[in-house]
């Protein structure tokens, strides 16, 4: 089961992101558990209490702790978790990659870009958890 967090102070946008994520993963027969937060502080408290998410869909501009502050904390404490920023503020795009952000999606392109980002995330997630590894070796004959 995938654990997904959505954090956006705009309840309508958080609901839309959640609906798109549920549709995507349902069509791929993937069980997910989604937790939505309208307060970045509440998400931060849960993270400090040890709650783990595989994927976090974050807004950047929020009251209190902004998305960049959340991303830094997540990057430092849950390096395997993936972050997708969904924002109206494109000016933070370069800085966002300092925290290994997986994708940066403008809210105006959400319907087109989020399913593609989720597809790419799911492929990577599957590869990272695969039970099979390819080991390249060089054959040396003596």
Identify the function of each model-found stretch.
Residues 8, 58-59:
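Active-site residues of response regulator receiver
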Residues 36-55:
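Acidic, metal-coordinating helix/loop segments flanking the phosphotransfer/catalytic sites
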Residues 39, 66-69:
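Acidic catalytic/metal-coordinating carboxylates
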Residues 10-35:
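Two-component/phosphorelay signaling modules centered on CheY-like receiver
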Residues 68-79:
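Short amphipathic alpha-helix used as the core "switch/output" element in two-component signaling
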Residues 116-142:
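Conserved binding/recognition cores within well-folded domains
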Residues 63:
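The feature encodes the CheY-like receiver
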């Amino acid at each position: 089961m995938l654990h997904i967090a959505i954090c956006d102070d705009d309840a309508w946008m958080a609901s839309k992101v959640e609906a798109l994520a549920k549709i995507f993963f349902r069509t791929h027969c993937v069980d997910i558990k989604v937790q939505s937060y309208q307060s970045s502080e509440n998400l931060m408290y849960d993270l400090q209490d040890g709650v783990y998410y595989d994927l976090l869909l974050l807004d950047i501009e929020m009251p209190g702790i902004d998305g960049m502050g959340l991303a830094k904390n997540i990057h430092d404490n849950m390096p395997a978790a993936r972050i997708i920023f969904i924002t109206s503020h494109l000016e933070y795009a370069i800085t966002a990659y300092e925290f290994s952000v997986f994708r940066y999606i403008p809210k105006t392109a959400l319907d087109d870009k989020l399913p593609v980002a989720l597809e790419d995330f799911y492929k990577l997630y599957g590869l990272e958890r695969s039970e099979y590894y390819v080991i390249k070796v060089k054959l040396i004959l003596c």
